[in-house]
């Protein structure tokens, strides 16, 4: 697992991309975004210590939404293998 910093308005990932990581917010705020006919919509605003981006690791589909730093933000990248190992050892976290 590695920490990565993102500046205000920088995308962590974009809708439709393939997934290599889930993320845990260490500091800052992340907006979850989705494109629609009306433009980009903010679906949620997340803060530490929230995990996000895990659905694409679980189902193997492209990212269903984007994630953008709302302010200077630090996240921890979690690989698919690490995430799946954690879930197998902590099944209560999967609900």
Residue ranges and their predicted role:
Residues 11, 44-95:
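Cyclic-nucleotide recognition modules
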Residues 40-42:
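Short, mixed charged/polar active-site loops
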């Amino acid at each position: 697992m590695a920490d990565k910093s993102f500046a205000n308005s920088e995308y962590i990932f974009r809708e439709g991309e393939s997934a290599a990581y889930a993320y845990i917010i260490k500091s800052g705020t992340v907006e979850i975004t989705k494109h629609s006919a009306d433009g980009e919509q903010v679906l949620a605003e997340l803060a530490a210590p929230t995990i996000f981006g895990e659905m694409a690791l679980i189902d193997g589909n492209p990212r269903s939404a984007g994630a953008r730093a709302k302010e200077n933000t630090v996240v921890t990248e979690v690989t698919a293998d690490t995430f799946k190992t954690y879930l197998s050892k902590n099944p209560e976290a999967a609900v």
